[in-house]
Structures are given as structure tokens and as C-alpha cells.
């Protein structure tokens, strides 16, 4: 499926950019790179940059400027945009609040779809876990390997390598109607997080983190493609992406709060990672059983939805 292949690129690059951002941030505040940035001197111009943090922020401003330039190169699709303010006499806030009923209706519609609910719950959990994985790796590396922030941030780049490999592999091997077969990989991800507490050697940690990232990349690409397919058919791509992003960001905040609370309640880093891994594996097991129940009780509806996915010639 072309949609799965496209998601291989999109998801792989998105996850890689998030994790590599942590890698870049760790290096920017490190002694060597920050010293090199502070040594840059342009005659007759004083930028007022005197600390490592200020130099790091200045470097990120350049990254944002580059990203903004990339956005200007996105071709116009010709789709007519829906105006935010349908009634000019209303304020922007009032116009935004007026869209909420439509948003919640779309959210409910996707959660009640027999394939949409499985793909949305899987991608939501993945992003919730992946969004907090960088903090887990930093904390684990500090305790298990004795690394400082700069050294530990380099390990997050290792996860990005695995994610990219997994995403590419999924785009080559998976089809849209096969997406639900990757659910067990989510359970494996949670169990691998638990096994992380037993690793204290860097040469064992590197292939382990590559494997962890690879499972994530292979999991999220077909599931995200299936979610976009169902969302496009149910409500259109724009609303579907809005629903997806809302649920994923909420999960990132929720799991992040759960991990932080575990540490605050006195759990060690290893204990918090173990509990976090158990939660991820447990929720994925529930999703697996949920899909199995749908297959038993709504087999005709699922067969029809999968037939639509197989016939999706637009992607």
C-alpha cells in the first residue's frame, strides 16, 4: 500500500527528529559544542550571547528558521480551506469554541469504528510511550551506565536508528489490511522496557535500544496508515488528524505524569521504568483482546472494512 509506504517516511522521520532533537540538545549544552559556539565572533556585532544555554537557544532559533523555510516549499494542493471565523462578528475564541461539538463528534466516530478504535488506541499509546522514552533513556543511562546528560542524550540517537529501520521495513513488507497483525509488537515493547533495568553494559545497550526503536517503527507505520485510511473515509483527513493529535498528546501528558508521579512517590528509576513497561504491555494486551473480541462479535463489519482497505486505490 502506498499509504503505508508514505507513513514509513513520515513516521520514521518524525520520530527520528524528536529523538535526534534530544541528542542535539544534550550536545548543545555539553562543554565542547557550547565552547565552540561561544567562540564564534562576528566583528562589529554583539549578539549578547555569553552562556552555554544562550548559545543553545540561538542554535535552535536557526533550526526553527530552517524548518520555517522548508514549510514554504510545501506545494499547494488546491484544497479550499475552511475559514475559522464563519461569522466575522464573533471573536476568534468564540469561533474556535463553536468548532468543539464537531470535533467531539469526530472523536466519538473514530473511537466507535471497529478498525479506527484499534488503530487510534495503538498509535495513541505508542506516542505516549515514545514521547516519554527519551526521558526514560536519560534517567536509565545516568543510573545504569553513570552517564551525564550529554553522554546519555547520544543514546537516544541509537533509538532513532532502530526506529528508522523499523519504519522502512514496515513500509516494504506491510499492507493496509495487515496492520492489526503488528499489535503483539506493542506488548513486546513494554516487556523490553522492563528488561532495560537489567542492562549495565554499553555494548549490550546499543543493540537493545536499536531493537526497541525498530519494534516501535514497525508497529506505528501500518497502524498510522490504517488510522488515516479510516479517518479519511469517516470524516476527512483534516478532522482525523486533529482527533489523532489530540489523543496522542493527551497520552504523552498522561503517561509522563504517571512516570513522574512514580518517581515522586519514592520509586527508584529502575522501579519506575518497570512499572511504566508493565503499563505499556498491559494496555497493548487489552487492545489485542479488544480486537479479538471485535473479530468474534463483529466479523462481518470487520470483513467489510478490511475489504474497503484492500480496495483503496487512492493510496
Regions inferred by a protein language model and the residue ranges of each:
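Helix-to-loop junctions at the C-terminal end of transmembrane segments
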Residues: 29, 165-179, 263
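Intrinsic disorder in cytosolic terminal tails and internal cytosolic loops
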Residues: 88, 230, 289-315
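A single, central transmembrane helix in multi-pass transporters
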Residues: 23, 29, 33-57, 106-165, ...
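Substrate-agnostic recognition of the 12-TM MFS/MFS-like secondary transporter fold
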Residues: 1-30, 118, 126-134, 159, ...
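C-terminal ends and interior cores of transmembrane alpha-helices
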Residues: 187-201
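Hydrophobic alpha-helical transmembrane segments
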Residues: 5-85, 157, 162, 270-289
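Cytoplasmic membrane-interface "Motif A"-like loop-to-helix N-cap segments
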Residues: 172-189, 237
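Juxtamembrane intracellular "pre-TM" segments in multi-pass secondary transporters
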Residues: 74-121
Amino acid at each position: 500500500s502506498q499509504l503505508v509506504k508514505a507513513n514509513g517516511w513520515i513516521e520514521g522521520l518524525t520520530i527520528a527528529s524528536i529523538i535526534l532533537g534530544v541528542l542535539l540538545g544534550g550536545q548543545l549544552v555539553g562543554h565542547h559544542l557550547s565552547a565552540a559556539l561561544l567562540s564564534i565572533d562576528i566583528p562589529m556585532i554583539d549578539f549578547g550571547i555569553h552562556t552555554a544555554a544562550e548559545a543553545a537557544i540561538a542554535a535552535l532559533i536557526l533550526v526553527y528558521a530552517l524548518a520555517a523555510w522548508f514549510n514554504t516549499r510545501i506545494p499547494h494542493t488546491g484544497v479550499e480551506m475552511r475559514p475559522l471565523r464563519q461569522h466575522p462578528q464573533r471573536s476568534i475564541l468564540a469561533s474556535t469554541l463553536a468548532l468543539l461539538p464537531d470535533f467531539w463528534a469526530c472523536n466519538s466516530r473514530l473511537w466507535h469504528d471497529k478498525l479506527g478504535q484499534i488503530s487510534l488506541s495503538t498509535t495513541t499509546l505508542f506516542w505516549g510511550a515514545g514521547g516519554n522514552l527519551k526521558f526514560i533513556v536519560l534517567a536509565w543511562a545516568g543510573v545504569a551506565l553513570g552517564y551525564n546528560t550529554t553522554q546519555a542524550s547520544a543514546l537516544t540517537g541509537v533509538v532513532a536508528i532502530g526506529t528508522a529501520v523499523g519504519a522502512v521495513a514496515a513500509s516494504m513488507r506491510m499492507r493496509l489490511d495487515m496492520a492489526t497483525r503488528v499489535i503483539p509488537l506493542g506488548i513486546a515493547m513494554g516487556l523490553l522496557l522492563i528488561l532495560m533495568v537489567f542492562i549495565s553494559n554499553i555494548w549490550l545497550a546499543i543493540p537493545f535500544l536499536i531493537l526497541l526503536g525498530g519494534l516501535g517503527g514497525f508497529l506505528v507505520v501500518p497502524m498510522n496508515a490504517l488510522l488515516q485510511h479510516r479517518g479519511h473515509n469517516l470524516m476527512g483527513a483534516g478532522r482525523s488528524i486533529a482527533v489523532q493529535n489530540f489523543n496522542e498528546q493527551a497520552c504523552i501528558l498522561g503517561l509522563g505524569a504517571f512516570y513522574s508521579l512514580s518517581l515522586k512517590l519514592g520509586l527508584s528509576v529502575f522501579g519506575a521504568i518497570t512499572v511504566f513497561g508493565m503499563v505499556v504491555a498491559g494496555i497493548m494486551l487489552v487492545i489485542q483482546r479488544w480486537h479479538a473480541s471485535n473479530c468474534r462479535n463483529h466479523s462481518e463489519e470487520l470483513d467489510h472494512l478490511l475489504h474497503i482497505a484492500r480496495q483503496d486505490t487512492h493510496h
